[in-house]
UniProtKB/Swiss-Prot annotation:
It catalyses: a quinone + NADH + 5 H(+)(in) = a quinol + NAD(+) + 4 H(+)(out). The keyword NAD applies. GO terms for cellular component: plasma membrane. GO terms for molecular function: NAD binding; NADH:ubiquinone reductase (non-electrogenic) activity; quinone binding. Its main location: membrane. The lineage of its organism: Bacteria, Bacillati, Chloroflexota, Chloroflexia, Chloroflexales. This is NADH-quinone oxidoreductase subunit D 2. It holds the Pfam family Complex1_49kDa.
């Protein structure tokens, strides 16, 4: 005869509280959570609603991009870089292209250099608009989300005009650009520049002095400059602590040393300062785009790809007239070029911080190794430092303020 099933009472299950003793609990936040979108899991240790520790668990969006690039020719690998930081694909294209160009020691035409700067700064604005809209939405400010995506739509229209794609553009090539800018490119950019400064003013009117925004961001997620440097923070997250470090100024590339712009910095290293820094960065990017647009207009038509025929294919007109040029074009795209044995490292200022690319060549048409220094991966490691002692409700705002893109974290 079986024993009867007995159900324990709540008093038997719950251990009575002991005076002076507290216990922490471990909970999962994500990956199935509105703020993590299925791609990030946070293991939280909580004392009530107070965060004791945070352990990010990544890998939910792993794509193996770095390994896949080893099986592609150098030029074909460009398309894979779009998929890392998918909110700033042009920055990924540029970093990889600069590293391979350094390996090849090729010169880039001035028109291509200016176009690269112009488009990556538009990309920076676009990325910051996504951050601003989603960050505000996480804190229940839906109007800002709608307004920010209104301007982002204009930028994506410009990318579509240039490359035919709104996000995965693959427009930059090793040696220059895929093809020249369209004739209506400059007028379209100028239309955007005419309205963008006033739009940024609108965002600030809605948020900068908003009491609810201030309550959720001022003094929350604080990190000092010394800790930020020790943890490897870069980009707006570092500059919000008062450190005026920007690769575009410290180690200029693509002619950035010839442009006039400032490095916005914060003081307190909290969520609010990270917000103010990114807003100011959008204004500086508008300033750079204006200068680049003027230079393109003054420069006029010209080549947008290197004249080195070991790297770049012959012009289209030659392919239709010369069998040798047709064969050259075919072999260059099917077999690829062969850089000399060696390695090269290049870092740029992406919207999320320092993006680095390390390329190793063994003399074959395919890279022996490609490694990216992804700023989002490093910035995420600071989450525990900033979250300790804060309420669980602050975590959503804190994650958003770091602006991570899990595509480059799990590359």
């Amino acid at each position: 005869m079986t024993e009867p099933i007995t159900v324990p009472t709540p008093q038997q299950i719950i251990e009575p509280a002991v005076a002076g003793r507290t216990e922490t609990m471990v909970l999962n936040m994500g990956p199935h959570h509105p703020s993590t979108h299925g791609v990030l899991r946070l293991v939280l240790e909580l004392d009530g609603e107070v965060v004791v520790n945070v352990a990010p668990d990544v890998g939910y969006l792993h794509t193996g991009i770095e390994k896949t690039m080893e099986s592609k020719t150098y030029q074909k690998a460009v398309v894979l870089t779009d998929r890392m930081d998918y909110l700033a694909p042009l920055s990924n294209n540029l970093c990889y292209a600069l590293a391979v160009e350094k390996l090849l020691d090729v010169e880039i035409p001035e028109r291509a250099q200016i176009a690269r700067v112009l488009l990556t700064e538009l990309q920076r604005i676009s990325s910051h608009l996504v951050w601003l809209g989603t960050h505000a939405l996480d804190l229940a400010a839906m109007s800002v989300f709608l307004y920010a995506f209104r301007e982002r739509e204009q930028i994506l229209d410009i990318f579509e005009l240039v490359s035919g794609a709104r996000m995965m553009t693959s427009y930059f090539r090793i040696g220059g650009l895929a093809y020249d800018l369209p004739s209506d490119f400059i007028p379209t950019v100028e239309q955007f520049l005419a309205v963008m400064p006033s739009r940024i003013d609108e965002y600030e009117d809605l948020l900068t002095a908003n009491p609810l925004w201030l309550e959720r961001t001022v003094g929350v997620g604080v990190i000092d400059a010394q800790s930020a440097i020790a943890l490897g923070l870069t980009g707006a997250n570092l500059r919000a602590t008062g450190v005026a470090y920007d690769v575009r100024k410290a180690m200029p590339y693509s002619g950035y040393e010839t442009y006039s712009f400032e490095i916005p910095v914060g003081k307190n290293g909290d969520i609010y300062d990270r917000y103010r820094v990114r807003i100011a960065e959008m204004r500086q990017s508008v300033k750079i785009v204006q200068q680049a647009t003027e230079r393109l207009r003054e420069l006029g038509p010209g080549p947008v790809v290197t004249s080195n025929r070991k790297v770049a294919p012959p012009p289209k007109r030659e392919i239709t007239e010369s069998m040798e040029s047709l064969i050259h074009h075919f072999k260059l795209w099917t077999e690829g070029f062969k850089p000399p044995r060696g390695d090269a490292y290049v870092s740029i200022e992406s919207p999320r911080g320092i993006l680095g690319c390390y390329v190793v060549s063994d003399g074959s048409p395919k890279p022996w190794r490609v490694h990216f220094r992804a700023p989002s991966f490093i910035n995420l490691q600071s989450l525990a430092h900033m979250a300790k002692g804060r309420m669980v409700a602050d975590l959503v705002a804190l994650i958003a303020s770091l602006d991570p893109v899990l595509g480059e974290v799990d590359r």
